Design a protein with these regions (language model features):
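N-terminal loops that bind phosphate or other acidic moieties
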Residues: 2-75
């Protein structure tokens, strides 16, 4: 299964996961979110994203999605 990492502003990613869980009647496997706040040091997120990718990687890759192209989470 391909892992999915949602990198978003605020809690948008977790809200999307919660919506999917409501529709599917179960929490999706291999899906995680990371909330990015623009007032934080963005360099710290490099390590966190690497760790999340490693935990999601099961041999088929990881799809990384952001909420707004070109915005802070996308950079």
């Amino acid at each position: 299964m391909i892992g999915i990492l949602l990198v978003t502003h605020g809690e948008i990613g977790q809200s999307l996961i919660n919506c999917a869980a409501h529709i599917l009647d179960s929490t999706p496997k291999s899906v995680e979110s990371l909330s990015i706040k623009s007032n934080n040091d963005l360099s710290k997120y490099t390590y966190i994203i690497s760790q999340k990718i490693q935990s999601l990687e099961k041999g088929n890759g990881v799809l990384i999605m952001t909420d707004i192209y070109g915005a802070t989470p996308c950079n």
